[in-house]
Amino acid sequence: MLSPVRITVTGAAGQISYSLLFRIAAGDMLGSNQPVILQLLDIPESRKILDGVVMELQDCAFPLLAGIIATHDPMMAFDQTDIAILVGARPRRKGMERKDLLQTNGEIFRNQGKILNQVAKRDAKILVVGNPANTNTLITMKNAPDLPAENFSGMLRLDHNRALSQVAMKLNQPVSNIKKMIVWGNHSSTQFPDLYHAEIGDTKVINLIKDPIWIENYFIPTVQKRGAVVIEARGLSSAASAANAIIDHLRNWFFGTADGDWTTMGILSDGSYEIPEGVIYGFPVICKNGMREIVQGLEINPFSRTRLDAAYNELTQELDSIRHLLP
């Protein structure tokens, strides 16, 4: 039997975690032979709910679940963690400006970065889900300078999956047939779901759709605004689909992307595609042996260029508003 992997999940009493934890414990993320220890963190006010979640996890009798720690102490939750999934963040309330959300959540992620720096395993992988995810990833990473920058990523996989789904429905194709989708930029309404490189078999998706008006006026805004539409329909934000995206993101990170395909991750920009260094930006990446690498050499047409730049400009504005949270 393999040694258990310690997985920290913040916001563990919340909606996304309720859809996530049972799948992790069942082996959906790391496989059917990998035991896990769940280290669950939430605020003291959520303790009763978290206790209920723990009871349900116990009652499932998962063979792979080697232990559960439930706490409001981040030092305990992050201690010797192998994987940290940072879901917990305050939601945007009515009347709250985006800058207010950046400030409130930025302080949470600054503190968590500092604690990760102290007690997490040195090769721990950290996935930031709580919004605004890109900038929260940067805050966490900068406050954990002893951990490798390449071990931090922000989640754009939900956006990536939404884009795949829209194309699959448009072309009446299985999602699994669609390769090389990209969502550039920020996990926000400036993101750019880019299907100019996407393929089904050896055929470009744009040559199958043959409808630039659908792409510009339906596909792109539908993916950009999908989260808000789900909230309007459900009265609650995306939870099961976000949990599924977390599973997909981490499976690719650990086990690799399929040959001839890539995925989207929010990672530290390095100058690729004329996006200046220093922000967490959605790029197409190939994963192999636990590492990820930006796909290089893709042609960026003028239509795409303006959208890549708009996302970068928004990220620099976010960065300017939280510089005081960086060491």
UniProtKB/Swiss-Prot annotation:
Keywords: NAD, Oxidoreductase, Tricarboxylic acid cycle. One of its GO terms (molecular function) is L-malate dehydrogenase (NAD+) activity. Pfam families: Ldh_1_C, Ldh_1_N. GO terms for biological process: malate metabolic process; tricarboxylic acid cycle. It is an enzyme of class 1 (oxidoreductase). The active site is at 187 (proton acceptor). NAD(+) binds at residues 11-17, 105, 112, 129-131. InterPro entries: L-lactate/malate_DH (IPR001557), Lactate/malate_DH_C (IPR022383), Lactate/malate_DH_N (IPR001236), Lactate_DH/Glyco_Ohase_4_C (IPR015955), Malate_DH_type2 (IPR010945), NAD(P)-bd_dom_sf (IPR036291). Belongs to the LDH/MDH superfamily. MDH type 2 family. This is Malate dehydrogenase. It comes from Nitrosomonas eutropha (strain DSM 101675 / C91 / Nm57).
